[in-house]
């Protein structure tokens, strides 16, 4: 499943295609959304916001389209004259004079009014987004030490969107390798230096991935570009200590780590 950096890249692509352009055609597959089709004609997308793995497409009439791709949903950008060839099921079409964005296969789609943005179950539950430029290491440190999270092992905590939105499995293993910790550690057991390093890594690594990577299968090293240190590298040598990277399962997900320098 795509993680925060990939979701934000997708949002950037959608914005670049249709932001600020009048909508000439709008179509929704779900009957409960049909009434909004005519309300959106002539309106425009003001911005596309990410909340972890959910997208919020904001319109100029104050409506907001909530969508969560889950495992199978995918957005596509096409020329308006193009007829995409795909076996996927179309759920949403937002068309402008030159570009159209299409959402396929997703099932978690709703239209929200402004007051619903603060009461929607997922949006209420999700924590601060790691790609939010206003989120600071100090706030992350406070969350790590809060009664709600301080006793939880990082193996599960770093996958919990209620802690920080936008983290996922590859970010989990890369962050823990960066700070030399294991999935079994808990925030309450860290010293001040470890806690500070973790709080910074929880923001810096996702933001670096977003800025320089964007696709899960891009694992090339060009200068300072993001590359995996341990993810999918079991059996290889750790570049930090020379140990052998191992693979196990933690919180029902593959976990990659170096026993030589993560302890």
From Swiss-Prot:
Name of the gene encoding the protein in the UniProt record: nei
Cofactor: Zn(2+)
Zinc finger boundaries on the chain: FPG-type: 229-263
Catalytic reaction annotation: 2'-deoxyribonucleotide-(2'-deoxyribose 5'-phosphate)-2'-deoxyribonucleotide-DNA = a 3'-end 2'-deoxyribonucleotide-(2,3-dehydro-2,3-deoxyribose 5'-phosphate)-DNA + a 5'-end 5'-phospho-2'-deoxyribonucleoside-DNA + H(+)
GO function terms (MF aspect): class I DNA-(apurinic or apyrimidinic site) endonuclease activity; damaged DNA binding; oxidized pyrimidine nucleobase lesion DNA N-glycosylase activity; zinc ion binding
EC code(s) of this entry: 3.2.2.-, 4.2.99.18
Keyword line: DNA damage, DNA repair, DNA-binding, Glycosidase, Hydrolase, Lyase, Metal-binding, Multifunctional enzyme, Zinc, Zinc-finger
InterPro entries reported for this sequence: DNA_glyclase/AP_lyase_DNA-bd, DNA_glyclase_Znf_dom_DNA_BS, EcNei-like_N, Endonuclease-VIII, FPG_cat, MutM-like_N-ter, Ribosomal_uS13-like_H2TH, Znf_DNA_glyclase/AP_lyase
Family of this protein: Belongs to the FPG family.
Top-level taxonomy: Bacteria, Pseudomonadati, Pseudomonadota, Gammaproteobacteria, Enterobacterales
An example Gene Ontology biological process: base-excision repair
Protein name: Endonuclease 8
Residues that hold DNA according to the record: 70, 125, 169
């Amino acid at each position: 499943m795509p993680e925060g950096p990939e979701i934000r890249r997708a949002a950037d692509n959608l914005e670049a295609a249709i932001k600020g352009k009048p909508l000439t055609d709008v179509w929704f597959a779900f009957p409960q959304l049909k009434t909004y089709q005519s309300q959106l004609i002539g309106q425009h997308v003001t911005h596309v916001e990410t909340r972890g793995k959910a997208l919020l497409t904001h319109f100029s009439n104050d409506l907001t389209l909530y969508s969560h791709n889950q495992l199978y949903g995918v957005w596509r950008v096409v020329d308006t004259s193009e007829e995409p060839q795909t076996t996927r099921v179309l759920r949403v079409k937002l068309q402008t004079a030159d570009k159209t964005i299409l959402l396929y296969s997703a099932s978690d789609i709703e239209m929200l009014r402004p007051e619903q943005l603060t009461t929607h179950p997922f949006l209420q539950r999700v924590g601060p987004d790691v790609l939010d430029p206003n989120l600071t290491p100090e706030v992350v440190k406070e969350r790590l030490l809060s009664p709600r999270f301080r006793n939880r092992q990082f193996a599960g905590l770093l996958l919990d969107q209620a802690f920080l939105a936008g983290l996922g499995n590859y970010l989990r293993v890369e962050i823990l390798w960066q700070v030399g910790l294991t999935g079994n550690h808990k925030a309450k057991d860290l010293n001040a230096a470890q806690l500070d390093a973790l709080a910074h890594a929880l923001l810096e690594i996702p933001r670096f991935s977003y800025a320089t990577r964007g696709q899960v299968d891009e694992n090339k090293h060009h200068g300072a570009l993001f590359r995996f240190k341990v993810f999918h590298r079991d059996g290889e040598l750790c570049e930090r200590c020379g140990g052998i990277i191992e693979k196990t399962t933690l919180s029902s997900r593959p976990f990659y780590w170096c026993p030589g320098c993560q302890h």
